[in-house]
From Swiss-Prot:
Its cofactor is FAD. InterPro entries: CBR-like, Cbr1-like_FAD-bd_dom, FAD-bd_FR_type, Flavoprot_Pyr_Nucl_cyt_Rdtase, FNR_nucleotide-bd, OxRdtase_FAD/NAD-bd, Riboflavin_synthase-like_b-brl. Its EC number is 1.6.2.2. Its main location: mitochondrion. This is NADH-cytochrome b5 reductase 2. Gene3D superfamilies: Nucleotide-binding domain of ferredoxin-NADP reductase (FNR) module (3.40.50.80), Translation factors (2.40.30.10). It is a single-pass membrane protein. It is an enzyme of class 1 (oxidoreductase). The gene is MCR1. GO terms for biological process: ergosterol biosynthetic process. One of its GO terms (molecular function) is cytochrome-b5 reductase activity, acting on NAD(P)H. Keywords: FAD, Flavoprotein, Membrane, Mitochondrion, Mitochondrion outer membrane, NAD, Oxidoreductase, Transmembrane, Transmembrane helix.
Length: 296
């Protein structure tokens, strides 16, 4: 019996070798699958511009529209992560490139299309061009550019301060976190606008708050209330935040996005896309540190 066992053991290295080879093959196949799977993403982070046609234009307010673009393939996703943006470009009649960053509001997992919510600025070169387009016209895009790579449960809570179209990257965060059953991060959004009609993505935000009432808390602020508006009238004040928002803590991260005057008032401006600059304004006065505040 012992002799038989001894003879059978001599095949053990061969068996182990075959097993190791099988594992190695599986790993290689998995890697190849991952690489091949990248083709299901429209944007791969390279330097290639992709022309996407407009398939739908929806008016959201007197100066804001939602543009829906078709991705190159119906089974593709955009390739963006939370939180990231893409670059949009058009070429002027004289051959100059006009490039602007935009944060899609469509879900990262949405196939075949991508949505942008854009506000028209009277002297804005890109927005004036975009608002002059119609369905089937194309816009060039490339990216994505990662601004902040969100990791579930990195914080107990996040505080979001936004105004106008600054809601776009904030909505991306709210939607991504709330719809992830594994992410328990509490969300506190304070969103300011001129009138109730100017509140962008309100139905989407309200639906998330209704669906996840224990996780998502949203407070709207308007300069002038009308009708049955549910929210606050006036600015998002220092006093309001000191009493209602989560206290400064390493367990609470703040994200800010809005027009320049808004950024100046609450966090101070960014120096550049790569340089957050110093933390000033209301958040600094409330005791938040630079490491606890991110400016989109």
């Amino acid at each position: 019996m012992f002799a038989r066992l001894s003879r059978s053991n001599k095949f053990l290295p061969i068996a182990l070798g075959v097993g190791a080879a099988s594992i190695a093959t599986a790993i290689i196949l998995q890697r190849n699958y991952s690489i091949m799977n990248d083709t299901s993403k429209a944007f791969l982070g390279d330097n290639e511009w992709i022309d996407l046609p407009i398939i739908k234009i929806e008016k959201l307010s007197h100066d804001t529209k939602r543009f829906t673009f078709a991705l190159p393939k119906k089974d593709q996703v955009s390739g963006l992560i939370t939180a990231s943006c893409i670059l949009a470009k058009f070429v002027t009649p004289k051959g100059s490139n006009v490039i602007r960053p935009y944060t899609p509001v469509s879900d990262n997992g949405t196939k075949g299309k991508m949505e942008l919510v854009v506000k028209h600025y009277e002297n804005g070169k890109f927005t004036s061009h975009l608002f002059g387009l119609k369905e089937n016209d194309t816009v060039s895009f490339k990216g994505p550019i990662t601004k902040w790579e969100w990791k579930p449960n990195s914080y107990d809570s996040i505080t979001l301060l936004g105004a106008g179209t600054g809601i776009n990257p904030l909505y991306q965060l709210v939607h991504h976190i709330a719809e992830n059953p594994e992410d328990n991060t509490k969300i506190h959004l304070y969103y300011g606008n001129k009138t109730p009609e100017d509140i962008l993505l309100k139905s989407e935000l309200d639906n998330l708050q209704k669906k996840y009432p224990d996780q998502v808390k949203i407070t709207y602020f308007v300069d002038k209330a009308e009708g049955n508006f549910e929210g606050e009238t006036g600015f998002i004040t220092k006093d309001y935040l000191s009493h209602q928002a989560p206290k400064p803590s390493e367990k609470n991260q703040v994200f800010v996005c809005g027009p320049p005057p808004f950024m100046k008032a609450y966090s101070g401006p960014k120096v550049s896309p790569q340089d957050q600059g110093e933390l000033t304004g209301i958040l600094a006065e409330l005791g938040y540190s630079k490491s606890n505040v991110f400016k989109f």
